[in-house]
């Protein structure tokens, strides 16, 4: 493959799967001798992006306002000035702005790639994500979603490339890891105890299933299990009212002394190591189940609702943890079973991150001729 210049577009570089994938592909491009450009409003992951050797150009292309159209000429000039070969849009508004910019470039226009990271509600606005010359779907669930809701999409343009995990970043931990548990309990005393530690990572939104996790904990403790629950990420800025609801529910259930509702942690490998059972209880089907891969890499069992990309990933990696959505009795039974007889983790975890990077660069190669 000749050296390419690839620009990735996304709203910002704060946190999340879209941002993480952007950094991972920037790293792969630079490693392979290509030029990696990223356009966004910036954010706390900017230093990590620049550490990959990628170049960042600051434009607020995620602001949902007609004012954002003023960035179209700037993007067009950028694509021409940098002799961009491929424009890769990772969310809807940046994709629309890129489409408008490319329309004015004629035969000199770069190839257009999109990645569908989520299961957005079908609409004309969302349809832009299915309009790339190549459309990367992060799971078979996403591919089916695209073909069902945008039937004019040519299936030959779709490429399924699951998100990946670097096993070196999520090293296998002993079962059970007393040192990791002690470190977590020192920071969050409610998590101290000899019973199971349940972990539900995720943002402070109702869709992440925090209520289901609290109810599961209450039922397990009623069964005589000294279980504890840690929900890192639920205490989001601006989500004080939601956190207050969760705290009220915990008190009502009589489990407030066994729950830690905290801000996100940057030490997720250590969080997995400290836990005995990882929960993925999103109320709405999600595009992919990266948490499943991360937890299995560390050697922890996962319990989740069997729908969307999470169900797809669980069935592939640990089918014992896939439970009929919203069946609280089945969830409780599966939790006890996974703790009593945790499934053996893979002897070695494949480098699914490198596989994702290689597959994405192969898509770029398809369009570079």
Where do the model's predicted regions map?
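Conserved acidic donor-binding segment of nucleotide-sugar-dependent glycosyltransferases
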Residues: 316-329, 336-341
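Short hydrophobic beta-strand element within catalytic cores of glycosyltransferases
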Residues: 38, 301-304
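A conserved, positively charged/aromatic
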Residues: 103-140, 151-152
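Nucleotide-activated donor-binding/catalytic signature segment of Leloir-type glycosyltransferases, i.e.
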Residues: 243-263
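A conserved mid-protein helix/loop that constitutes part of the nucleotide-sugar donor-binding site
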Residues: 16-24, 196, 203-219
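Short His-centered aromatic/hydrophobic patch
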Residues: 89-95, 116
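Acidic donor-binding loop of glycosyltransferase active sites
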Residues: 273-287
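Short alpha-helical donor nucleotide-sugar binding micro-motif in glycosyltransferases
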Residues: 79, 264-265, 271-275
């Amino acid at each position: 493959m000749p050296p390419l210049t690839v620009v990735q577009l996304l709203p910002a570089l704060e946190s999340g799967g879209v941002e993480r994938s952007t950094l991972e592909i920037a790293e792969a491009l630079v490693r392979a001798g290509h030029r990696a450009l990223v356009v966004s409003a910036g954010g706390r992951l900017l230093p990590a992006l620049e550490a990959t050797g990628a170049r960042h150009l600051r434009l607020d292309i995620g602001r949902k306002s007609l004012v954002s159209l003023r960035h179209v000429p700037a993007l067009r000039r950028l694509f021409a000035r940098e002799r961009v070969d491929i424009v890769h849009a990772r969310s809807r508004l940046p994709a629309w702005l890129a489409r408008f910019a490319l329309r004015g470039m004629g035969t000199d226009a770069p190839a257009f790639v999109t990645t569908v990271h989520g299961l957005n509600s079908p609409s004309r606005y969302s349809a832009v994500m299915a309009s790339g010359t190549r459309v990367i779907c992060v799971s078979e669930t996403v591919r089916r979603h695209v073909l069902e809701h945008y039937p004019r999409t040519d299936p030959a343009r779709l490429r399924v490339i699951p998100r990946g995990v670097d096993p070196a970043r999520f090293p296998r931990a002993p079962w059970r890891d007393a040192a990791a548990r002690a470190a977590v309990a020192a920071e969050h005393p409610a998590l101290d105890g000899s019973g199971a530690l349940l972990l539900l990572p995720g943002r402070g939104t109702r869709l992440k299933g925090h209520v289901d996790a609290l109810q599961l904990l209450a039922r397990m403790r009623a069964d005589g299990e000294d279980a504890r629950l840690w929900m890192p990420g639920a205490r989001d800025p601006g989500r004080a009212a939601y956190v207050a609801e969760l705290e009220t529910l915990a008190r009502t259930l009589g489990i407030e002394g066994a729950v830690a509702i905290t801000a996100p942690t940057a030490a997720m490998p250590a969080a997995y190591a400290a836990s005995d059972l990882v929960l993925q209880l999103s109320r709405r089907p999600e595009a992919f189940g990266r948490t499943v891969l991360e937890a299995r890499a560390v050697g922890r069992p996962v319990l989740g609702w069997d729908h969307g990309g999470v169900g797809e990933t669980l069935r592939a990696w640990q089918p014992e943890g896939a439970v009929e959505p919203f069946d609280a009795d089945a969830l409780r039974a599966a939790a006890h079973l996974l703790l009593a007889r945790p499934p053996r983790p893979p002897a070695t975890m494949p480098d699914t991150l490198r596989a994702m990077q290689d597959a994405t660069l192969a898509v770029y190669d398809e369009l570079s001729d």
